[in-house]
Curated annotation (Swiss-Prot):
Annotated pathway: Amino-acid biosynthesis; L-arginine biosynthesis; N(2)-acetyl-L-ornithine from L-glutamate: step 2/4
Name the record gives this protein: Acetylglutamate kinase
Transition state stabilizer, annotated site positions: 35, 248
Location (main, coarse): cytoplasm
Catalyzed reactions per annotation: N-acetyl-L-glutamate + ATP = N-acetyl-L-glutamyl 5-phosphate + ADP
Source species: Synechococcus elongatus (strain ATCC 33912 / PCC 7942 / FACHB-805)
HAMAP family, sorted: ArgB
Domain of life of the source: Bacteria
Role summary: Catalyzes the ATP-dependent phosphorylation of N-acetyl-L-glutamate.
Pfam family, any one: AA_kinase
Cell compartment(s), UniProt: Cytoplasm
Length: 301
């Protein structure tokens, strides 16, 4: 068939698949931990795109793990029961009543919805919270006056490794308990980073509501596509990385220091952001790499 009769759209799809081949080969059998939150949880079109991306990762031989929060839905349910959401230094103040709502929403509603959507899309998802099987052991946060807000004390990866080996997709909510069984609300970025480290993951990917790390927050086109750990720390010291981006970058740095090969901060408002970041030469966000990182196919060099 002559090339002029080939539909342009079909040719584009084949070109994209060809571009993805080195990445498909490199990442087959590797674990990728995705923190799912932000706008990607609020818009139906974006929800569907994320679920399709996650199932795609599993279908091409990767081992996706999903860790999620659910801030907007928590706020909505707190409003229904007459509790005013309160925050201190970016952390949700979590008294006993708030903790009960957080646990109900994250474990009983958001988690089950994600599991159902992945399964409906053709994946095999299994829902967890950090308390299940003592997957995540919590401890109280160092900051005083914020109630039942926790940090990750340890991760028991043996709970989910057998599932990954059999092709299941773990979906984990960021609620965990301490040694005494007290439940804590933990930042989902933190949980994702620690689980990625425990699984020796290839990638940690944070879906956010920003393009990535910007040289100038007022200029979306100033995206920094790739950084190492010292460069990331320097951007924090210079104030270029500030506000809510600091804990995300810190989370990435901690996971890299514990053996994760690359951490990505990407814009979850873009449909199919996961696939665009992992399987295209240009990517769409910021990738932070550790000192020993080596990529067989390095598009930015």
């Amino acid at each position: 068939m002559s090339s002029e009769f080939i539909e342009a759209g079909a040719a584009d799809r084949v070109r994209i698949l060809s571009e993805a081949l080195p990445y498909l080969q490199q990442f087959a059998g590797r674990t990728v931990v995705v923190k799912y939150g932000g706008a990607a949880m609020k818009q139906e079109e974006l929800k569907e795109a994320v679920m399709r991306d996650i199932v795609f990762l599993a279908c091409v031989g990767m081992r996706p793990v999903v860790v999620h929060g659910g801030g907007p839905e928590i706020n909505a349910w707190l409003g229904r029961v007459g509790i005013e959401p309160q925050f201190h230094n970016g952390l949700r103040v979590t008294d006993a009543d708030t903790m009960e709502v957080v646990e109900m929403v994250l474990v009983g509603r958001v988690n089950k919805d994600i599991v159902s959507r992945i399964n409906t899309t053709g994946g095999r998802a299994v829902g967890f919270c950090g308390t299940d099987g003592r997957l995540v052991l919590a401890r109280p946060h160092d900051q005083e006056g914020i109630g039942f807000v926790g940090e990750v004390n340890s991760v028991n990866s043996e709970v989910i490794e057998p599932l990954l080996e059999r092709g299941y997709i773990p979906v984990i909510s960021s609620v965990a308990a301490d040694e005494n069984g007290q439940s804590f609300n933990i930042n989902a970025d933190t949980v994702a980073g620690e689980i990625a480290a425990a699984l020796n993951a290839e990638k940690l990917i944070l879906l956010t509501d920003t393009r990535g790390i910007l040289e100038d927050p007022k200029r979306p086109e100033s995206l920094i596509p790739r950084l190492n750990i010292p460069q990331s720390r320097e951007l924090i010291a210079q104030g270029i990385v500030g506000g809510g981006m600091i804990p995300k970058v810190d989370c990435c740095i901690r996971s890299l220091a514990q053996g994760v090969r690359a951490a990505h901060i990407i814009d979850g408002r873009i449909p199919h952001a996961l696939l665009l970041e992992i399987f295209t030469d240009a990517g769409i966000g910021t990738m932070i790499v550790g000192s020993g990182y080596h990529e067989a196919h390095q598009p930015w060099q």
